[in-house]
Amino acid sequence: GICNKVAGIISPLIFAALILKANDSELFALIESGALDEATKNAMLNELIQRVIIPYIILGIILLLTGIGIRYSVLPEINTDEQNATDEQDNKHTDKKSILDFPYLILGALAIFFHVGTQVIAIDTIINYANSMGMDLLEAKVFPSYTLGCTMIGYILGIILIPKYISQKNALIGCTLLGLALSFGVVWADFDMTLFGHQANASIFFLNALGFPNALIYAGIWPLSIHGLGKFTKTGSSLLIMGLCGNAILPLVYGHFADQYSLRIGYWVLIPCFIYLVFFAIKGHKINSWR
């Protein structure tokens, strides 16, 4: 997770340095002004699009070579057909017939869906949001890295504090409540502040700060969702992985409201997500029956 977030911090800065130029702010303003004829505007937009092609080709080649390396590397085989004796014992005296008989597992998969969606929204939309609040794009390009930096801090504190000083369940409750509070800050904060050398609306920094509680939520949801599954653990884990589709779906929901109303109103999508996460952290993971 830490290596992943380090890459996430560095990569936007590298791509921005490769793609954005010092005079692009004037170029963007000119394109949005409406002063250009259609042919000139399209030519400028095409030039901007062309900049991303080579970096993505290079990235694709790197991923291809990595995949080939993994394919021919000597890695131990994982025998998924071996049934753990403990799993069998866990289910020996239960009438559970499928994963659908574990309500807390289904609720956990939904929790992961909402959680990963809020992660992507907080990271991927912040540049456009900062720009809509009057910040130059060349200045706003660093904000995804700030969000991921907050996530890194959360990971490190989690390693130090959990479970020695704080239980994973209490950490989950605290992080979901903090995420909810920060989400209200994003949609309600209406004052400027200066942080990290940037003077901007406080809601932008609240969006950055969401990276911190989001760091520990996934690790809290997972064990609470698969405990006691026994022989259904592998299938249950697969269901939780399917919850990662929230990465793709919730940003579209945000985009719908952002297009219909405003970028800031779009962030109201975060509120019900975190309300549900608070519910799961406090109550949902304890529900053992649908009745």
Regions found by a protein language model. Give the residues of each.
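Glycine-rich segments within core transmembrane alpha-helices of 12-TM secondary carriers
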Residues: G1-F28, L36, S237-P251
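Helix-to-loop junctions at the C-terminal end of transmembrane segments
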Residues: I19, G154-Q168, A258
